[in-house]
Amino acid sequence: MDYLKHIDQQWLLAINGWHSEWADMLMWYISKSTTWLPLYALLVGLIVYRFGILSPSLCREGRRGSSLLRVLIILAGFAVAVGVSDFVSSGIIKPWVCRLRPTHEPALAGMLHLVNGYTGGLYGFVSSHAANTMACALLFALLYRNKYATAGLMLWVALNCYSRMYLGVHYPADIIGGLAIGALMATLTYGMVRRLVDRVDERSEGVGASCRWPEGDEDYPTADS
């Protein structure tokens, strides 16, 4: 266990030790949730388009009667996935494990490069940033099933995770734990959302009218369709 902790610290120091003024500014803004508000708006818009009344191929025989409720269920699913991930990571695991953040670890005093004096809260295991971004990204990937969107969102998750280590507020193990929680919540929420949406569609349009869920990129309209 001590060896693993040592490796964890060494990886953190290596990441945090590579710094510059421009990287400080970049990682600071990557780590801020408000930086990504336009991305969140884009994701909502894509959900509305793909699963709402504007979708050209959502339900069999053009049935779109339950489009509003369908979209609301999916958006509520995102709120549940991210909200539960945040609660589990920050409200349960951090105060239970009580692992100090690197910035509050006496053994690392004076060894970390701090950006804008930022040290974060007292405990760091697991990373809420990692959990929340993974929950959002994976749930969208499971719903939308587009390889380009999935790749872009996974890059977004990776940047957020790297920024937390660059800022010195999380060990790599904190990040890995957060990613696992976010992935679990996204997977569970995806199954729940699918069942609810199918039930709503069947009640609205009759048996056999359930949503045709995308299975891959071929399910999306192209310029030739």
Give names to the regions the model predicted.
Residues 29, 37, 73, 77, ...:
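Alpha-helical transmembrane segments of integral membrane proteins
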Residues 78-91, 95-100, 176, 182:
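Membrane helix-loop-helix hairpins that form the core translocation module of multi-pass transporters
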Residues 44-89, 150:
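Interfacial segments of alpha-helical transmembrane regions
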